[in-house]
């Protein structure tokens, strides 16, 4: 028996109880492919070159290699059908790849789980394996996915797309039936309040804290307050209320977070050196500053008032999931929410003064994230990844409260899991031109200018 067949015999047996597959140390059979594996391409003229490479491997000699074959139209690679899938059961797929001369790995190196019925028809849409981490020269990709209704097998698809000079090697492939992860519930509260004639940042903050005490009862995981809670109602300029982080306002928010054992997010104005930022802070359950986000997209009015823009889209790994922050005018542009989603954000917390509800809904839908807003001239709500309002606080002095499930999958009837598809099909490698420039030239004056 070859090393491959021994591996399959010991580890790749599908039983009625569960499926556990391990494949590595690949050895080519007479047709050039390891047992069970075959080449797939949409058309012969766009097929890649596939081969077993005994020289490039991760743990034991022999990997599944795909070459772009000097063809810019190339798309395809290795496939293997695995029987013994149980409809409705959960499976964890893991594989490792090494890429050479691949311009954009995020969409050109593809792993998918293509679920099939007993008659080998598609049982729903394929699941893209989009989670990845570097491990030396190799990249680990993995996915936890639920087999659709009527699924009886799954085709493991390992592809290379439109990379004529590239080679990718796949190794250490596993598929395991695993326990249902169950719900991952997070309770969120978002506050609708607009203090007026407070004359001080401290008084405005006090009114927000008082409203939380009056409206938010029971356990919460995160509480969101609006943009600029230290300036609203005060009649003061940004520079007059700007403070350091940590500072007096984060200390008061920290007391709230600690007393409720809840994360708290809010917009304040931050001073660092000569710069003043429109900043959103995230306070952890112990009352410490977990992190901050400086508003990237400043409207002209804020620039003229002396604010400085930020330059990054951080995400924060909390004890319930991954959180991103946006502020107000950010919602008018696609890239803040997109950047947060590609970094793994599951919930975007958005302190906002006023903004476009339609664009906010688009940000949730296109990135398949929960979007939470707390605003003055913008509604206060909790929105799901389909853009549906789960809770809305319509009156001042009220709170929108909802419990969401971060493990819930939002599937499109025709397209499948759009979160996974977006992560793998997003073309960040195609650069947009600079606004106002045509073919690299400065635009001509027009309209009498």
Predicted regions and their residues:
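Cys-nucleophile CN-hydrolase/nitrilase-fold catalytic domain and related Cys-dependent amidase chemistry
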Residues: 202-206, 210-285, 338, 354-362, ...
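C-terminal beta-strand edge segments of enzyme domains
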Residues: 136, 142-144, 315, 375-449
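CN hydrolase (nitrilase-like) catalytic-core segments centered on the catalytic cysteine
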Residues: 245-264, 322, 328-405
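A structural microfeature
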Residues: 124, 169, 291, 390-391
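Hydrophobic h-region of N-terminal signal peptides that target proteins for export
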Residues: 7-17
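Extracellular and organelle-lumenal recognition/adhesion modules and their flexible linkers in secreted
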Residues: 15-187
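Active-site catalytic loop in hydrolytic enzyme cores
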Residues: 271-343, 358, 362, 366
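Beta-strand-turn-beta hairpins that frame and shape the catalytic cleft
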Residues: 179-188, 315-324, 347
């Amino acid at each position: 028996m070859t090393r491959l067949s021994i591996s399959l015999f010991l580890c790749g047996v599908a039983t009625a109880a569960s499926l556990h597959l391990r494949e590595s140390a690949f050895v080519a059979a007479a047709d050039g492919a390891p047992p069970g594996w075959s080449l797939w391409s949409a058309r012969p003229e766009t097929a890649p070159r596939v081969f077993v490479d005994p020289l490039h491997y991760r743990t034991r000699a022999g990997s599944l290699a795909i070459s772009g074959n000097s063809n810019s139209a190339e798309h395809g690679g290795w496939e293997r059908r695995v029987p013994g899938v149980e409809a409705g059961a959960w499976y964890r797929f893991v594989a490792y790849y090494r890429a050479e001369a691949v311009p954009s790995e995020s969409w050109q190196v593809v792993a998918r789980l293509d679920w099939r019925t007993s008659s080998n028809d598609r049982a729903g849409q394929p699941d893209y394996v989009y989670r990845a981490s570097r491990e030396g020269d190799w990249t680990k990709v993995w996915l936890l996915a639920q087999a659709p209704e009527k699924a009886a097998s799954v085709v493991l698809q390992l592809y290379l797309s439109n990379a004529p000079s590239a080679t990718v090697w796949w190794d250490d492939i596993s598929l395991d039936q695993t326990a249902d992860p169950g719900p991952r519930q997070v309770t969120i509260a978002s506050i609708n309040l607009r203090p007026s004639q407070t004359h001080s940042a401290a008084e405005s903050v006090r009114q927000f804290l008082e409203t939380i005490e009056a409206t938010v009862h029971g356990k919460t995981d995160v509480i969101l307050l609006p943009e600029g809670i230290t300036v609203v109602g005060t009649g003061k300029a940004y520079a007059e209320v700007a403070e350091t982080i940590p500072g007096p306002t984060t200390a008061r928010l920290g007391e709230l977070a600690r007393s409720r054992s809840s994360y708290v997010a809010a917009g304040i104005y931050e001073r660092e050196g000569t710069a003043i930022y429109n900043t959103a802070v995230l306070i952890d359950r112990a009352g410490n500053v977990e992190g901050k986000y400086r508003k990237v997209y400043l409207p002209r009015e804020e620039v003229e008032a002396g604010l400085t823009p930020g330059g990054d889209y951080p995400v924060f790994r909390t004890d319930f999931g991954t959180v991103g922050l946006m502020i107000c005018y950010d919602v008018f542009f696609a890239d803040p929410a997109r950047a947060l989603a590609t970094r793994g954000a599951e919930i975007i917390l958005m302190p906002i003064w006023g903004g476009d509800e339609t664009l906010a809904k688009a940000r949730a839908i296109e990135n398949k994230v929960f979007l939470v807003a707390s605003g003055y001239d913008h509604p206060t709500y909790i929105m799901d990844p389909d853009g549906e309002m789960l809770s809305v606080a319509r009156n001042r002095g009220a709170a929108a409260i909802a419990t969401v499930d971060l493990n819930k999958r939002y599937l499109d009837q025709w397209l499948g899991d759009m979160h996974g598809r977006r992560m793998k099909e997003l073309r960040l490698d195609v650069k947009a031109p600079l606004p106002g420039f045509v073919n690299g030239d400065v635009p001509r004056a027009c309209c009498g200018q």
